[in-house]
């Protein structure tokens, strides 16, 4: 779905015109446009988009990663470097809920009656009504986050796994010039999806 067809080189101005393009290794185009309705998916933690010029995510274009993952599985992040970055209104970079899966990660939530929240730059939320019980622990950096967030806990039964939320994913942007964000960058963890599950 690259336009023109083929993995872009350092002399190419790349356009994702429609559909979904998945990158599993680093690429080095001269510039990049993610068009309206098109999606660029990053897989592998080390995959990086090195763009000598500008990156533009148009209205309705998206950069993202695959769904949340378990401890020991391959993690993913949106990882890019460019001169200038523009995210137009309704353009989107989202890794929301695409960090560690439920009860996974260094700051994973615990299994209680209603579970506890997963941690990252801060500790996870305490379970109600058992406010003295442990919660997902803090790790990483609050001011310069680099890692995925951990998944929340739930009632200790696999029947309630789907009620808890996964952690937020990771986005790293190195922009040497100007970053103009009129759209959205989202790395939120998931909220609770039902009774006895935390977010």
Q: Where are the predicted features?
A:
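Glycine-centric low-complexity/flexibility signal
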Residues: 54, 62-199
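Extracellular beta-sheet-rich ligand-binding/adhesion modules
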Residues: 1-84, 157-160, 168-178
């Amino acid at each position: 779905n690259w336009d023109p067809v083929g993995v872009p080189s350092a002399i190419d101005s790349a356009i994702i015109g429609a559909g979904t393009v998945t990158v599993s290794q680093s690429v080095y185009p001269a510039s990049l446009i993610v068009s309206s309705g098109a999606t660029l998916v990053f897989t592998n933690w080390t995959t990086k988009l090195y763009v000598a010029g500008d990156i533009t995510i148009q209205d309705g274009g998206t950069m993202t990663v695959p769904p949340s993952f378990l401890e020991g599985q391959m993690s993913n992040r949106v990882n890019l470097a460019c001169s200038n970055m523009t995210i137009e209104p309704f353009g989107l970079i989202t890794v929301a809920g695409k960090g560690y899966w439920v009860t996974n990660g260094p700051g994973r939530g615990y299994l209680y009656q209603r579970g506890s929240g997963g941690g990252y730059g801060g500790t996870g939320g305490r379970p109600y009504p058992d406010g003295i019980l442990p919660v997902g622990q803090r790790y990483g950096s609050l001011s310069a986050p680099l890692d995925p967030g951990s998944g929340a806990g739930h009632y200790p039964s696999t029947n309630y796994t789907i009620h808890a939320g996964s952690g937020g994913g990771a986005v790293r942007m190195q922009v040497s010039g100007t970053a103009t964000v009129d759209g959205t960058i989202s790395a939120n963890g998931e909220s609770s999806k039902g009774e006895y599950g935390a977010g």
